[in-house]
């Protein structure tokens, strides 16, 4: 079976599957009882095609708009521009001077002419009653007016499905419809023959069973939909920095309004259409909106920023002009939201299993019906009544047909693929409580197969709460942890050096020191920037004073490829100076001078270089992150087109930043090792720092290899083949090094790789990995969008929790499949053999519907929602090549099926003698006993299925309230069916002895299951 599944249903990958692969497996699933329900959690490929068409249209539209705006720019200044634009009265009364349609046409149409008519960005700022310095007012009344005129920043979504819609979808089941038709005919014929109410019992029994199945199914599906709705709401929680009422603050992107001033940096997604106000080196990736991969430069000359695009480089301030469904992104997202998520490989595989078993079931159903009809025909031939059909015989034919249809109901395990969704929804909800947000359903199951985790250091293995604890300035290396130590340090070095140091810290930064609510000083920026700015303040520096004394004219933001950040500032008397900071060795290599202990600039000779490198090594060996700060005197002239100097710098000094290892990381790494998962650290930090942290975390062992990115890049494929299995630390790595490592692990070594990332440049590695894990706190929006799981607390221990839940999902589905296939096999064979040998089916349509509900909806609820056990992380991972239906499962399925078949067959052949049954009701009593024993076999088999290999199946059973509730409901309802609903279910009340025998024979399946688990089989 596994080879058939891999061949026909193996094209669908955990991520990035082609539409052709998604389409192909659907065509193979031709035995589907209820397409609406079966394919509810699969991608809507037609909606995706529609979204792609919108992208292509956008690409052409914006290309034309850019060409037109470029042509207009050549003569726009020479024209006397006038506008025929008429301001709507309601907009004027609200206090604004431009309407939303006019605003939208400016940015979407890249219309420089209209922008010029309205006075440029400054003119629009006034017309929107806002200010670049202060932003909009936060007064509730004013915000309400703004929302009323310009709309809110939300796109139209499909309305939530109500419970009754799920009931309607459950009723679309073809087999249930056929059974309903049978029930209707049975009602009519029965009432005509036997009158009301006796003649209606059979028909009403089937109707009641159908309604019960429908309502239980709808309730389960509705609960799942609510869980997914909660998860979708979590995915959409994105915040952005804005200025409102002169205060820099964070708000949800859905609260943005036209007139807001938004602060954007590398990796941010642009949350609305807007105009560039000011910024440096801004490159925008518009591929998500237009499909165009080439980044677009944005500046005062080309100021248009489109919602949904991403900041690839640089930083800027933006004026929001258009929000929500007025933007092209809003329209695209409204379409994409209906496209749905890709189905997971496990869902597809189980659709394959359902299809195979469905075909077998259909074959058995047809044969069973044919055998039953043949038996009736033979009887009529013996009676010589070929052409005379009584009402009883017609009812028998109808019952045979209903039994055949119900065999299909039981045989087509529609619940298999849906159990995956149920289990994933349950796991995802629980993982949210454990600080992990799953964006891609498949990641949940794939994480259970992970064999390697490539983890960042900063913020994942460490706390990301950084402080400067050591510094070497003017040849003096001292501890500077705390304001007192920092002030003492500052007093011991020349004032000129302190001034240069503060200028470097406060001007060459992506952070900012602002006054927040309640006049509290607040530092905004990355943890590294925050640590440096805090150090600057503790040295007695004044951020605003230093910033106002110079003018920043060019910025090259930090990125993980260059490993440095640079600015050019203009000082009084038109003198230009460049400041640079970054990875210590890299920045130091670009220096040829340094500041000595007297504050003088002197050449950086071999002795001084060696001294500084020793300081870097010393700091790094103490697990400190080291940064080098340097400056370069440019002179009186600097062109904005010119690059920031790359060499000839003067070293100001080295700082050592403490970033402590997170509590519990060492234990989590040990858990990974015991689970057969290799943890590798991939960091941009210094090799010595990386090794110190890796040893502290338990990642780097005595026989492990630590290497730098540049050296890794130089290795040949043959060398990498020997190196990678022992590689535990990669330092000074670029994002492409991480991408290469992930690719080689997946292709060369067939590993299932999980990788963490936080920066924009990590997107390729996150995309390449089997499971991309983005950091929720330090991660950029670009990284989060490329990831499959967002680690909300940036903690490595949470990654281990995700792996544990992933394994739990995989094993829970295996348990459910094992349980369901056992019921399938027994129900099919019992009815088929009985029909062939006795001419009767012991399990009626109503009884089979109840069995179907036990094994389908209730079974999935019980087994697919088992919480993970700690010993899950003591097993080896399944890996890339593991079979889903393992040898262990086949052993359990076949052994348990054989036991149940032997019991039921003995009852059918010897049951009357064994129980002393005679009289007119003996057949009914025997069939009731068979039905009762069959159900109790499934109840106890459900308990046995909690563990596929362990004998102790009761561990933690009382903690799983869902499991206990399902078992209790099953037993209670079974008693009601036997004792009270016999008229409808074709059963008769049993005496105490018969009940005890039913329970004992069902229970004996557990020792049988335990004995089976002692039979050794290969794991796959």
UniProtKB/Swiss-Prot annotation:
<dbReference type="InterPro" id="IPR006068">
    <property type="entry name" value="ATPase_P-typ_cation-transptr_C"/>
</dbReference>
<keyword id="KW-0479">Metal-binding</keyword>
<keyword id="KW-0150">Chloroplast</keyword>
<dbReference type="GO" id="GO:0046872">
    <property type="term" value="F:metal ion binding"/>
</dbReference>
<feature type="transmembrane region" description="Helical">
    <location>
        <begin position="401"/>
        <end position="418"/>
    </location>
</feature>
<dbReference type="InterPro" id="IPR008250">
    <property type="entry name" value="ATPase_P-typ_transduc_dom_A_sf"/>
</dbReference>
<dbReference type="InterPro" id="IPR036412">
    <property type="entry name" value="HAD-like_sf"/>
</dbReference>
<keyword id="KW-1278">Translocase</keyword>
<feature type="transmembrane region" description="Helical">
    <location>
        <begin position="163"/>
        <end position="183"/>
    </location>
</feature>
<dbReference type="InterPro" id="IPR023299">
    <property type="entry name" value="ATPase_P-typ_cyto_dom_N"/>
</dbReference>
<feature type="topological domain" description="Lumenal">
    <location>
        <begin position="184"/>
        <end position="201"/>
    </location>
</feature>
<dbReference type="GO" id="GO:0005262">
    <property type="term" value="F:calcium channel activity"/>
</dbReference>
<dbReference type="InterPro" id="IPR018303">
    <property type="entry name" value="ATPase_P-typ_P_site"/>
</dbReference>
<feature type="transmembrane region" description="Helical">
    <location>
        <begin position="844"/>
        <end position="864"/>
    </location>
</feature>
<feature type="topological domain" description="Lumenal">
    <location>
        <begin position="371"/>
        <end position="400"/>
    </location>
</feature>
<dbReference type="GO" id="GO:0005388">
    <property type="term" value="F:P-type calcium transporter activity"/>
</dbReference>
<dbReference type="InterPro" id="IPR001757">
    <property type="entry name" value="P_typ_ATPase"/>
</dbReference>
<dbReference type="GO" id="GO:0005783">
    <property type="term" value="C:endoplasmic reticulum"/>
</dbReference>
<dbReference type="Pfam" id="PF00690">
    <property type="entry name" value="Cation_ATPase_N"/>
</dbReference>
<keyword id="KW-0406">Ion transport</keyword>
<feature type="active site" description="4-aspartylphosphate intermediate">
    <location>
        <position position="456"/>
    </location>
</feature>
<feature type="topological domain" description="Stromal">
    <location>
        <begin position="223"/>
        <end position="350"/>
    </location>
</feature>
<feature type="binding site">
    <location>
        <position position="762"/>
    </location>
    <ligand>
        <name>Mg(2+)</name>
    </ligand>
</feature>
<comment type="function">
    <text>This magnesium-dependent enzyme catalyzes the hydrolysis of ATP coupled with the translocation of calcium from the cytosol out of the cell or into organelles.</text>
</comment>
<feature type="transmembrane region" description="Helical">
    <location>
        <begin position="885"/>
        <end position="907"/>
    </location>
</feature>
<keyword id="KW-0067">ATP-binding</keyword>
<feature type="modified residue" description="N-acetylmethionine">
    <location>
        <position position="1"/>
    </location>
</feature>
<dbReference type="InterPro" id="IPR023298">
    <property type="entry name" value="ATPase_P-typ_TM_dom_sf"/>
</dbReference>
<dbReference type="GO" id="GO:0005634">
    <property type="term" value="C:nucleus"/>
</dbReference>
<keyword id="KW-0472">Membrane</keyword>
<dbReference type="Pfam" id="PF12515">
    <property type="entry name" value="CaATP_NAI"/>
</dbReference>
<protein>
    <recommendedName>
        <fullName>Calcium-transporting ATPase 1</fullName>
        <ecNumber>7.2.2.10</ecNumber>
    </recommendedName>
</protein>
<feature type="modified residue" description="Phosphoserine; by CPK">
    <location>
        <position position="46"/>
    </location>
</feature>
<keyword id="KW-1001">Plastid inner membrane</keyword>
<dbReference type="Pfam" id="PF13246">
    <property type="entry name" value="Cation_ATPase"/>
</dbReference>
<feature type="region of interest" description="Interaction with calmodulin">
    <location>
        <begin position="21"/>
        <end position="32"/>
    </location>
</feature>
<dbReference type="GO" id="GO:0005516">
    <property type="term" value="F:calmodulin binding"/>
</dbReference>
<dbReference type="Pfam" id="PF00689">
    <property type="entry name" value="Cation_ATPase_C"/>
</dbReference>
<feature type="transmembrane region" description="Helical">
    <location>
        <begin position="960"/>
        <end position="981"/>
    </location>
</feature>
<keyword id="KW-1133">Transmembrane helix</keyword>
<keyword id="KW-0109">Calcium transport</keyword>
<feature type="topological domain" description="Stromal">
    <location>
        <begin position="1"/>
        <end position="162"/>
    </location>
</feature>
